[in-house]
């Protein structure tokens, strides 16, 4: 298997006001060439810190990262020549219009003018930005500005794309357009490393995933493999006047608005479903989603953040 990104024992520690914060606590990852690899986890889990290290923006405290065979610390220039990055917080050149932003980015990467113009035109249409081509970036909404940054990177000829929360702030239609553009990059055999806390996005785009919590990889594999590794792979949603104590014999119980979620093995899930139906309670049973996997492993929803520290998102 050809490797695009190889990380071994990557740590990152911050010191502030006499206090030490561990952002990464020994990350091992291998991203195959041509794959889309998703890093999922809450804000503060360490996803952005890893992206910044792998894309040569930040030095690790220890460990190593190689991108396309080049060491990100010892040979950062070779890495930068072959990657493109959408940071979590983008700061585009506000005095340019949308067309200029994309076109000049491609020219600065060394792309010939004719090809840069062709790619700029194509990506503006693909991401529904053509009508805004002459709009100054400073006049765009936050979501439109984010979409322009995505256009820059996807129009490039970079072999590895680092996309840190690429669809943050976008409406559902715009998110789907970005997904389609990322899928095109995948078809072009480019490697994509993306972070997201939208689990539907992670599952739709990623051939492999790493679930990160507290600077560590908790689980790694395909979406199907990750779901299969939890002890209770089914979820039963029970509404009505039923107590947590009544449900505990069937599995792990989480309280939700209007009822309970029970994570259970298949036999217990079916038994609980039959019992709830017999008592007239609204009930549904389904295979566990990635959101359910996260909740079982971490004990908190993915949308519930850790206290934010510098660089630890």
Question: PLM features: residue spans?
Answer:
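A short, flexible loop at the N-terminus of ABC-type nucleotide-binding domains that lies
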Residues: 1-7, 13-26, 76
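Conserved ABC ATPase "signature" region
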Residues: 103, 107, 114-132
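A short, proline-enriched helix->beta-strand linker immediately N-terminal to the Walker B motif
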Residues: 155-159
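Catalytic Walker B motif of ABC-type/P-loop ATPase nucleotide-binding domains
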Residues: 161-165
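ABC ATPase "signature
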Residues: 220-221
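Short, charged/small-residue-rich alpha-helical element at the C-terminal edge
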Residues: 232-304
């Amino acid at each position: 298997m050809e490797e695009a990104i190889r990380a071994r024992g990557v740590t990152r520690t911050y010191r502030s006001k006499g206090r030490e914060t561990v952002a990464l606590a020994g990350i091992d990852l291998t991203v195959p060439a041509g794959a889309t690899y998703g890093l999922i986890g809450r804000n503060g889990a360490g996803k952005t810190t890893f992206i910044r290290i792998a894309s040569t923006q930040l030095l690790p405290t220890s460990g190593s990262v190689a991108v396309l065979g080049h060491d990100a610390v010892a040979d950062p220039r070779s890495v930068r020549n072959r990657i493109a990055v959408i940071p979590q917080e983008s700061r585009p050149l506000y005095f340019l219009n949308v067309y200029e932003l994309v076109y000049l980015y491609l020219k600065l990467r060394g792309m010939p003018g004719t090809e840069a113009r062709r790619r700029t035109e194509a990506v503006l249409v693909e991401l529904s930005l053509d009508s805004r081509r002459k709009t100054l970036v400073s006049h765009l909404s936050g979501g439109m500005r984010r979409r322009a940054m995505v256009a820059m990177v996807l129009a490039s000829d970079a072999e590895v794309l680092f996309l840190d929360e690429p669809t943050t702030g976008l409406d559902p239609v715009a998110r789907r357009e970005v997904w389609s553009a990322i899928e095109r990059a995948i078809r072009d055999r480019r490697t994509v490393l993306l972070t997201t806390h939208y689990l539907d996005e992670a599952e739709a785009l990623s051939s492999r995933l790493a679930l990160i919590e507290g600077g560590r990889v908790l689980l790694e594999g395909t979406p199907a493999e990750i779901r299969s590794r939890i002890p209770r792979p089914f979820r039963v949603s029970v509404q009505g006047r039923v107590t947590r104590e009544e449900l505990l014999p069937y599995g792990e119980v989480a309280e939700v608005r209007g009822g309970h979620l029970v994570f259970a093995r298949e036999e217990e899930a079916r038994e609980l479903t039959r019992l709830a139906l017999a008592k007239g309670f609204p009930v549904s049973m389904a295979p566990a989603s990635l959101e359910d996997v996260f909740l079982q492993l971490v004990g908190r929803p993915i949308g519930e953040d850790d206290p934010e520290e510098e660089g630890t998102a």
